[in-house]
Swiss-Prot record:
Keywords: Cell membrane, Lipoprotein, Membrane, Palmitate, Signal. It comes from Staphylococcus aureus (strain COL). This is Uncharacterized lipoprotein SACOL0482. A lipid is attached at residue 23 (N-palmitoyl cysteine). Transmembrane segments: none annotated.
Length: 263
């Protein structure tokens, strides 16, 4: 009888040990995608793309090659389209956006774009054209300057001091980001990863300082990419930091770097 009790106890200990090891393995897989898995490939692809941040001198894009699909003509070196935009909607108020987009043409080595201020209608989520302000800009010597006279000194100064996220963003600790949610569509091909960030994250602190984001809520990071996962060149890379997302109250920051055919 005593022998049976000891045997039962031994079996129970073995089963418990196997169960604990299984849980640890599942937890580790959730935090760190298994090497060779689609999740690991997605994270590796983003890691290669984000490794180029920051590019402090935008003129470096003239020498940077991107992912070319069938839409590119043979003699077209391509154009980089970079965008950064902050979206704010205080509780119970109108949603407003302000940001810039710049077309960096590798054929002509010229860069032109727009600085845009918009109001978004809450009823249909569309831009209120009566409230939209659009200013043409160009890049000269890594500096953004208006191409037309601007009487509003505040806006003029904002344009001249504008920095794209790609110029100051830093993802050197991206490999340490854990518990990501991944998706992949091989037909497009497009893929994404979502992470919960902390307030001490470098990029979060930069955005709070540059755009006066006062909320203490920890943001979510959404990464969206396009192109061949195995290709080392950048095709399309979208970044979104969501600080607040509620009905009638929103704060988020959008940034994108995209390689497109020249017009």
């Amino acid at each position: 009888m005593e022998y049976l009790k000891r045997l039962a106890l031994l079996i129970s200990v073995i089963i418990l040990t196997i169960f604990i090891m299984g849980c640890d393995s599942q937890s580790d897989t959730a935090e760190n995608p298994k090497e060779g898995s689609k999740e690991a490939q997605i994270k590796k692809s983003f890691s290669k793309t984000l490794d180029m941040y920051p590019i402090k001198n935008l003129e470096d894009f003239y020498d940077k090659e991107g992912y070319r699909d069938g839409e590119f003509k043979k003699d077209d070196k391509g154009t980089w389209l970079i965008r950064s935009e902050i979206v704010k909607q205080p509780k119970g108020k109108v949603m407003k956006t302000r940001g810039m987009q710049l077309y960096i043409n590798r054929n002509t080595e010229t860069a032109k774009g727009f600085f845009v201020l918009k109001e978004i209608s809450e009823n249909n989520n569309r831009v209120n054209k009566d409230k939209e302000e659009k200013y043409e800009v160009k890049m000269v010597g890594n500096k953004i300057i208006p191409t037309e006279q601007i009487n509003d000194e505040k806006i003029k100064k904002e344009i001249e001091n504008f920095k794209f996220f790609v110029q100051y963003g830093n993802f050197k600790n991206f490999e340490k980001y854990n518990n990501g949610e991944f998706s992949y569509n091989p037909e497009a091909p497009i893929y994404s990863a979502k992470y919960q960030l902390h307030n001490d994250d470098y990029n979060v602190r930069q955005l709070r300082k540059r755009y006066d984001i006062s909320t203490k809520e920890t943001p979510k990071l959404l990464l969206k990419g396009g192109g061949d996962l195995k290709n080392s060149s950048v095709g399309q890379n979208d970044i979104e930091f969501t600080f607040v997302e509620r009905k009638g109250e929103n704060i988020y920051f959008n940034d994108s770097v995209e390689f497109i055919p020249s017009k």
